[in-house]
Amino acid sequence: MFRTGKAIPIAPAKEDEALLNAAYDAVAEALAQGELVAIFPEGRITDTGELYPFRQGVKRIVERTPVPVIPLALKGLWGSFFSRRGGPAMSNPFHMRPFSKIALEAGEAFAPQAATPDVLQATVLRMRGDWK
């Protein structure tokens, strides 16, 4: 799944600074080639269904490769196979609620200099509404 999606491995600098730098290089290369790059700016999967604070990754990416940033809000993942509700994420194939509805909402693009972690998080929270 990750290979098909062209996932770029990443780790916090405190765990593996070389891998983090390689990830930023791979993102810059993908963007320069016109690829779309999706990131999860929280840096981890939520244990509660609520958003964690957005980290500085998007800011660092657009400082190096200034591109528009499109905020995306995932809705309905909490309680699904991909959430940590009831245990580790992606560990139980029967974890997904029957007929659960998952949605993705895209917002308006931000100019690179306007795409700060605080602005993006506020936008995603507004887009997500009461969904988890």
What kind of feature is each model-predicted range?
Residues 24, 28, 103-104, 117-124:
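Short, amphipathic alpha-helical "lid/cap" segments that border enzyme active or binding sites
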Residues 47-115:
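A cross-family acyltransferase "interaction/gating" segment
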Residues 122-132:
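Short, cationic low-complexity segments
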Residues 28-59:
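Catalytic-site beta-strand/loop segments enriched in glycine and acidic/polar residues
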Residues 1-32:
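Membrane-interfacial amphipathic helices and adjacent loop/beta segments
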